[in-house]
Amino acid sequence: MSDNIINVYCDESCHLENEECKTMVVACIRCPQNKVKSISNDIIALKKKHKIWKYAEIKWTKVSKSKIGFYLELLEYFFNNPHLRFRAIVVPNKRKLNHPAFKQDHNTFYYKMIYQLVDYFLRFDCSYNIYADKKENSYNAKKQMHLTRDYLQAHCLQPIKMENITSYKSELMQLNDFLQGAVCFYNRELHNTTTNIAKIKIIEAIKTRSIVLNKNQNHPKFNILIWRPNKK
């Protein structure tokens, strides 16, 4: 059955090791493969309704007063669509990560987080197409991606595919960017200092769903894990 083929779109916020932001978020959105086209068309129709160019990328960084109507309606669409699920892992302080102790680098850690992100919801009777936002084409990055796929495959009877794509080619990848951006924004406590009222409205709209963005949320629609590193 085509409902048993699941597309998963993964991305991150503030994952670079040496950037100023200490909070890292890795997140994904998923839905049945046979719903991708209709959902994408719905999002494009929303853009048209709000006079946004159909090829304009949806991003958390683009949330503004002039576009608040679109982003609030997009958020409502996500919560009302029964086929969409979101999950995020928040690393509150990546500066505390001790990579040498675990014989890894930061890029390896990123793919470990992708594994933790997806392994949580794997079902034996489903196959998965996993798309990660394209960051780099290095040999090591490709190796880590293939290893991640292999580890996930060990927990699933059906085939798992994993590849990189660019976000501008996928409405669902862009929707994930929007939601994970909200999670990262809140966990960086920027909601306490921002002058961007539109972003505050998005945060408040999420909170009306009884979702707490800086605590573990075992929520079927909007799942959050606050990740704490093991000590060595």
Question: What are these model-predicted stretches?
Answer:
Residues 1-232:
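Phosphate-ester processing/binding pockets and catalytic centers
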